Structures are given as C-alpha cells and as structure tokens.
Amino acid sequence: MSNDCTCPVTGRVDKPIASSGRANRDWWPHQLNLKILHQNPPLGNPMGEEFSYAEEFKKLDLEALKKDLYALMTDSQEWWPADYGHYGGLFIRMAWHSAGTYRTGDGRGGGGSGSQRFAPLNSWPDNVNLDKARRLLWPIKQKYGRKISWADLMILAGNCALESMGFKTFGFGGGREDIWEPEEDIYWGSEAEWLATSDKPKSRYSGDRDLENPLAAVQMGLIYVNPEGPDGNPDPVASGRDVRETFGRMAMNDEETVALVAGGHTFGKCHGAGPATHVGPEPEAAPIEEQGLGWKSSFRSGKGGDTIGSGIEGAWKPNPTTWDMGYLKVLFKYEWELVKSPAGANQWLAKDVDEEDMVVDAHDPSKKHRPMMTTADLSLRFDPIYEPIARDYQQNPEKFADAFARAWFKLTHRDMGPRSRYLGAEVPAEELIWQDPVPTVDHQLIDGQDIAALKDTILASGLSVSQLVSTAWASASTFRGSDKRGGANGGRIRLAPQKDWEVNQPAQLKTVLQTLERIQKEYNDAQSGGKRVSLADLIVLGGCAGIEQAAKNAGQAVSVPFTPGRTDATQEQTDVASFAVLEPAADGFRNYLKTRYTVSAEELLVDRAQLLTLTAPEMTVLLGGMRVLNANYGQSRHGVFTKRPETLTNDFFLNLLDMGTVWKATSEAGDLFEGRDHTSGELKWTATRVDLIFGSNSQLRALAEVYGSGDSQEKFLHDFVAVWEKVMNLDRFDLA
C-alpha cells in the first residue's frame, strides 16, 4: 500500500532534504571554508549578468524619488504609526545601522550592499523594528524598481529624513549594488548568545578591556556600544572609552564621533514601553505567517506608544522632529538621575526640568515627559576629551551643523571607495582625504610602442624577476574589495606608511623604487610632447615585464596585459593613520605572517583572497605562480618547490603532489615543515601551512591537480596571467 506522505525521491517520510542532516562542517568543524570565495554568484542574482546598476541609476529621477521619500516621512501608517507623526527618526536609525556596521580593520560591513535585509543583521537585537522601516519603504522601492537598489534607498531615506526635519546634508552618492544572499565572510564575533557580556565564554575582550580585532562593536548583535554602559553598567566615563574605541574602528575621530552622536540624537526617540518578555522572535525566527517581520509584541497594542525596542524609553530633547541645538542644550543644562525604564533598562532623566524643555509624548499630545539620556550620551559630558568638543559645538551652531553633515556623509559613504564610484547629481564637489584621492590624468598616456620599450629598459636595469614581481604585488595587493580601498593606483607604496611596512621589505623596496624612478625620469625628460609615465604605472609594468621574462625562462612566450592610466598621489593626499589599517598582518601569497595568530595561516590566506575578490581556482594558480617566481617575503625558500626559481612553471604543483615526498612538522606550533625524499630521507623542500594546504584540503588538492597535470603548463600560464592582470587592475574603476 502506498503512503501519500512518503517522499517520492528518497522513499522516506521524515527529514528527506539535505538541510535536515549533518553538514560537512558539523563533522569537521575546523574544515577550511572556501565558500566565502564564491558568494553571491551570478546564478543567484535575479537581475542577470547583463544588468548594469550604474546605467539604471542614470535613468532615475532622483528629485522625484526624494519627493516621494519626503511625503513618506509624515504619511503615518496604522500598522506602524510614526512617532510624533514623522518617520524621520526611524529612517535615520535604519540608515545609520546600515552603514554603521563598517569597520576599518578589514573594511567589511557597511551599507554598500544592502545586507541589512538578510541574516544576521536583519535580526540583530540592535536592529529591532528596522524591519518595519524597510516595509514602509517597499512601495517606493516597488515604484522605482531596478533604478534604485535597496542599499542606496536605505541611505537616501536617511538623508531625506534629515532634510525633511530642517537639516542641510553634505550630499549623496549612489552606486551601492544589492547582494542577494547573506555575506558569510564577515566575522561578527565568537559568542554563542546575543548581547553576551564580556564575562561570558568566547568573549571578544581580553586584558584591560581590549577589543578583539577586527570587531567594532562591544557585544554580539550591537552596532557600536551598549547604550546602558559597558556590559550594562551605567558608568558614563567607562562608556566614553567604549564609544571612542568603537567609533574609532569605524574611522571616526573624536570630533566626528561627538558630532554624530549629538546630531543623530537630535531626532526621534527610544522605545521601552514595557518588559521585553512581551516581544516575539526576530525576523529570522518568526513564524512564516509573519512574512519576514519580527519582534511582534503582545504588550497592549504592540505599536505606537506601546512599542518595545532597545528597552530605553523617551526622547533626548523637545521637538524631536526638528534640527536645532536642543540636544546639547539639554545635555549640559541639567543634572541627571539614574532610573529604570518601564522595560527595566538603565537610563537617565533630567532633574528639575523647565517647562520649555519637557518633551511632548510621541503619540498622546496631552502627555509630557522629561528628556532622557543614555549612559553613552552622558559620555559626551563626562569624558574629558569629548566634553570640550561638545561644548564647543554648543557655542558654535554652524560649526556643529557642518561637522555633523560631514560626519554623516562619511558614515554613509565610507565603504564605497574612491569618489569616482559615486553616482548622481548630489555628489559633493569637494574632495575629502578619507576618500583616498588620486590626481586625475593630465597628460598623454604611453602607447604600445612605449610600453614595449619601457619593458626592455626595466629588464635591462639589473632588477630581478623576483624584485619586479614582489614590488608590483606589494603595490596592488593592498586592495580590499570590502571597502574598495588600496590598490596600485596612486603609487602609494612609495609613501608613508606603506614604504615602511615590514612585509614590503623596505630596504629592497627602496632599491627598486630608486631604479624605477630613474627610468621614469629619463623617459619623461626625453618626451617633447605631453606624454608621461607615472611611477604607479611603471611599478605595475615592471611586474608584467618580470612575468614575461619568467615565462621566457620557461621557454614560453606570453604577453601580460597592461593598461596605463594610474597617477601618483602625494603624501598630502595620503592619511597615514587611515592607510595604516591596510598593512597586512598576513599575506600567504608572499608566505608572510607577522606573528602567530589563533587563526590558522591557511584561514588568513583565504581571508586575504576574499578581500582580493579571488575565486578558489584564482587563489590556487596565483599562489603557485608566486612561489616559483621567488616572490616570498625575505626571499624565504618555504614553498618554492622548484629547482629553477624565477621561471614561470607549474613546478609548485608538480612537486607538491609528488608522492615521493614525506612531510613532517619541524616547529612546535605545527606551522613549518620539511619535505624529505621517501627513500633516501634527503631534504627536498621546506614549507608553511599555506603551502601544504593545497595538498591537504580536498577541494584545494583537486584544484592543484588541475595545474599539476602533464598537459597543464599552457593552462597554468594563461590562468596565472589572467589573475595577475585582475589583481593589478582591482582599483581601476575607470576601466569598468
């Protein structure tokens, strides 16, 4: 007899799908995660491979869109009523929390991909009820369709919210493209519970409250700080330390931090009308009938004046829908008493409040409340560095408005890369130092004949293949696909801080740069017209020449593509502190590890490959080529599996896969190895974990076998040259 409940595929009744069983990572939790190299593939993008968001954005009537957003601000909906009849505070928070996940340590996070729509961000405790903000935006997104991404719309809505309440913003640049699945490459922390305090297992803190890198939030599920204070302790001075650390890791200095907090908290209110026990599960855990909405509340109406969010309740100042100096006035005018909100959260209320400073209730005009401050807010008054900055802003309203406008623009655009990527009519004309500016091309570029002649000159200069390749790699490989920073354009490898980074071998780098600068000067001086070559271009061209020579050494003729057009930035255009975060702590492609880390060297390699936007095959062929080109840090022999270095062959893979070699760890940490002849015991090679992972990991070994096959030399050369060109041009947004 048939069973109608039996699965027609497996014949089983219960749990017939793959996601119901144990995954490979459940069996082998330390398995190397290569999936982060293949996120958001074209097959998962409904827009199709021919879709160009930049072209669609050009068709957008930005003025009409903004008018619709302005109208939305005061179009209060019964299903989620607007506080004070204005959604401005909600949309500012949505935009802030979209952009505010950015951290300088690895450039990840931020609002550049619309990731707030997906887990985990859509369900973070700090993003409570922002699902409602996005649903309020849906009719507008639906109207304009592909011409505006969710990523751009969320930021623009924040701008329009500010403008609709009387604030003049600094500008807006579009160009953020949506992703279509959660980002898996971002490390948000190791804690196993939301909002875990620093005393819990797997804490992100060590020592004297030292926050783990690259994290930029104090607890799992928060954007920055706990508004109640460190671990909920209502200490404004201690909170100031947390604020400084987290905002600093988001690229904000003290002045920008004060401006952002004071400016942002000029608007809206916090929500803690009742106990959090009334709040239902977050969107990712909510039942299917909720259709992606979460945090359904059973407290009275569950909305409007009964809303429960952060647990803190109230507004910071009177007129929460108007730009004015009220926040700073109230902050310094009153003394503050610590109280518990109706939800039980620590917060502060002003004492002996004048009638003019009382806050009208957000939903019942017959009620008034005392202004409130969070512990984090009070750090602006009691932190010895923040306090004078805040008082200066209070006494200089125009300075404060300008500082907030600039800080807001930086907050919402920091992860977009150079100004050339911004789209739209509201892009500010002013060039800002944090945008890593490079000069525009103001000269005639070198042509094919010049390129060939310069290659010959470089190869005759006495510089080795290793030196040329290493220098070009050092220049280009600073690029981060996360925030579109770094890369060879600008030639900043010759400037502080990059010229002094240990990984760049400053002594060797100086020699190479002096030689290339001489070649550059001789060439430019010989030109009668306006033709010039930049050092940035010459550095990359030197790497191309080195690779062609290495292929020639192997008896192969290859032409490495080169496109001129890079320019040389000045030291004045380079923020040393800002660029310092680009220094590699590890670069597996150069077999460099600054120190030993709790994370394995092979995981750090994959992480860097992901930042370089490489696929697993690209990472594999690139590393194999770099090894035989002898491009290791310090000319180390680890992983140089060839008897003919500086010859572009697939020897790395041939010798890695040789079953006649027996490997044994030679360091207590298990990060250095010797490979000896299986029969004689003679030492053949030395290696690091980064080298041997290509023979150990089953996926990487499968790729290594492709390049280690007898007929693979031509494919190896082709694929290596292709990925080399890709890395050299990662920051060439002008070529897109």
From Swiss-Prot:
Domain of life per record: Bacteria
Reaction(s) this enzyme catalyzes, per UniProt: H2O2 + AH2 = A + 2 H2O; 2 H2O2 = O2 + 2 H2O
UniProt source species: Pelobacter propionicus (strain DSM 2379 / NBRC 103807 / OttBd1)
Cofactor: heme b
CC terms in the record's Gene Ontology section: cytosol
The UniProt record lists the keyword Metal-binding: yes
Residues involved in heme b binding: 265
Homology family: Belongs to the peroxidase family. Peroxidase/catalase subfamily.
Function according to Swiss-Prot or TrEMBL: Bifunctional enzyme with both catalase and broad-spectrum peroxidase activity.
Record site: Transition state stabilizer: 93
Co-factor: note: Binds 1 heme b (iron(II)-protoporphyrin IX) group per dimer.
Subunit structure: Homodimer or homotetramer.
Active-site residues, Swiss-Prot/TrEMBL: 97
One BP annotation, GO: cellular response to hydrogen peroxide
UniProt-listed InterPro entries: Catalase_peroxidase, Haem_peroxidase, Haem_peroxidase_sf, Peroxidases_AS, Peroxidases_heam-ligand_BS
CDD domains the UniProt entry points to: catalase_peroxidase_1 (cd00649), catalase_peroxidase_2 (cd08200)
Cross-link for Tryptophyl-tyrosyl-methioninium (Tyr-Met) (with W-96), residue positions: 224-250
Record protein name field: Catalase-peroxidase
The record's account of how the chain is modified after translation: Formation of the three residue Trp-Tyr-Met cross-link is important for the catalase, but not the peroxidase activity of the enzyme.
